[in-house]
């Protein structure tokens, strides 16, 4: 095969989610590790459901994550190629028109299941005469076009699942063109993957049967099939199915919640593999450490909450320059940006938390004072050092309070922290105190 070429082929019928990302990321990393090509292919053959706003959103999500494509292809611009392939299959006797309604097909399936047989299309349409077909067209309109499978075993070595063998006799002849003329994914993908030189296809394990039929379609058209690898499907933390429509798992929603790209990518690049999840600092590290053969077939549990500790750890390592715009957007004056970030970085989960910490510094907090500590806090506030507060102020203040009240340890420090910040835990007080602009109002 030629240079490694992979593709991510979303349908622009909604926003992409973490399941889509897993597929996109694997294909991206394979291409980049091999020095190959990564194609973004928009599977927009369904004109009713495909929307340009979703195309834009897909590109925005991938760009946010740094999954930059080498070129974009659109299936809606390639309909002539699909028609050529369909004509070739017809000429070979591998394409036939079928007219059953959904209700009729459902009744056939139920009958087969009741008889203990697999629910496979019975190929009744192959027995129709030309006259019968004309009558059905007049009555029902154009039929669907099915690919006639060779009823033999279809075998390949999967990059994740290993050796696969599927009996084509247990699979229905796939519909490749609908009655309204719309070309379906199974045929369009075969033509595209060949024309675009795709060498490796990584997708979910729910596509295994689809892959088997596509291998036969490719062979019928004289195409060499690419290498296939089918990753496990994601489930929720309790093993429940994930829904594409579960909004909190859409990438755009994760972005709005403050999840950092490298936190998300670091998790998805290892989830379901035999390697532990490791937070990476950049894409180059992800590429270097990726190995598709390390992934397994078992369903993979995904918990969105795992993203937030990773995001926090990623942010802690960033210099001020990397977050200067975010710090400024939180309202922090430029001259306080450096000490503020030094304080906040250890105490945030996402950048969305910056505004809350600055509000504390700017406006103060509602004091948290136990009844038995009220007199102590009043006395302590009167001992606050004169002049601007700096890194030494906390030590000087607590020493003065200790000498005046006799308190020490937790009995000294905790009431002061709660009175100043309204919280039982948080940043080092020596770091936070110089940033507190209204603390003297408590005296």
Swiss-Prot record:
Molecular function, one GO term: ATP binding
Subcellular location: Cytoplasm
Domain of life: Bacteria
UniProt entry keywords in alphabetical sequence: Aminoacyl-tRNA synthetase, ATP-binding, Cytoplasm, Ligase, Nucleotide-binding, Protein biosynthesis
InterPro entries: aa-tRNA-synth_I_codon-bd_sub2, aa-tRNA-synth_I_CS, aa_tRNA-synth_I_cd-bd_sf, Glu-tRNA-ligase_bac/mito, Glu/Gln-tRNA-synth, Glu/Gln-tRNA-synth_Ib_cat-dom, GluQ/Sye, GluRS_core
Pfam families named among the record's database cross-references: tRNA-synt_1c
Function statement: Catalyzes the attachment of glutamate to tRNA(Glu) in a two-step reaction: glutamate is first activated by ATP to form Glu-AMP and then transferred to the acceptor end of tRNA(Glu).
Assembly notes: Monomer.
Protein name: Glutamate--tRNA ligase 1
Source taxonomy: Bacteria, Pseudomonadati, Pseudomonadota, Alphaproteobacteria, Rhodobacterales
Gene: gltX1
């Amino acid at each position: 095969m030629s240079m490694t070429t992979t593709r991510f082929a979303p349908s622009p019928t909604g926003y992409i989610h973490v399941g889509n990302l897993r597929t996109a990321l694997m294909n991206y990393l394979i291409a980049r590790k091999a020095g190959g090509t990564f194609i973004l292919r928009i599977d927009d053959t369904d004109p009713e459901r495909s929307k340009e706003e979703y195309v834009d959103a897909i590109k925005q999500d991938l760009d946010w994550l740094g999954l930059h494509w080498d070129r974009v292809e659109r299936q809606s611009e390639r309909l002539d190629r699909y028609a050529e392939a369909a004509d070739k299959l017809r000429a070979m006797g591998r394409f036939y028109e079928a007219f059953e309604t959904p209700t009729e097909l459902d009744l056939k399936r139920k009958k087969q299941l009741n008889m203990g047989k697999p629910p496979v299309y019975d190929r009744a349409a192959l027995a129709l005469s030309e006259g019968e077909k004309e009558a059905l067209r007049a009555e029902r309109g154009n039929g669907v076009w099915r690919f006639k499978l060779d009823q033999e075993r279809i075998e390949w070595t999967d990059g994740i699942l290993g050796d696969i063998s599927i009996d084509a006799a247990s699979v229905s002849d796939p519909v490749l063109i609908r009655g309204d003329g719309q070309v379906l994914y199974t045929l369009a993908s075969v033509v595209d993957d060949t024309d675009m030189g795709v060498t490796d296809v990584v997708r979910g394990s729910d596509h295994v049967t689809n892959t088997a039929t596509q291998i036969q379609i490719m062979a019928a058209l004289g195409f060499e099939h690419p290498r296939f690898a089918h990753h496990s499907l994601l489930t929720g933390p309790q093993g429940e199915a994930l829904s594409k429509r579960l909004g909190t798992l859409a990438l755009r929603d994760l972005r709005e919640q403050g999840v950092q790209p490298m936190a998300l990518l670091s998790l998805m690049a290892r989830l379901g593999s035999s390697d532990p999840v490791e937070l990476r600092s950049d894409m180059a590290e992800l590429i270097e450490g990726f190995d598709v053969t390390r992934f397994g077939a078992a369903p993979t549990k995904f918990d969105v909450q795992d993203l937030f500790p990773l995001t926090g750890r990623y942010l802690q390592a960033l210099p001020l320059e990397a977050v200067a715009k975010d710090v400024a957007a939180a309202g922090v004056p430029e001259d306080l940006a450096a000490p503020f970030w030094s304080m906040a970085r250890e105490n945030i989960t996402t950048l969305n938390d910056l505004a809350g910490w600055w509000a504390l510094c700017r406006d103060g907090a509602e004091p948290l004072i136990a009844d038995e500590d009220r007199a102590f806090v009043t006395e302590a506030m009167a001992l606050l050092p004169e002049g601007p507060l700096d890194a030494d102020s906390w030590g000087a203040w607590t020493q003065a309070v200790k000498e005046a009240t006799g308190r020490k340890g937790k009995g000294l420090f905790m009431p002061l922290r709660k009175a100043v910040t309204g919280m039982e835990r948080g940043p080092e007080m020596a770091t936070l105190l110089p940033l507190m602009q209204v603390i003297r109002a408590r005296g």
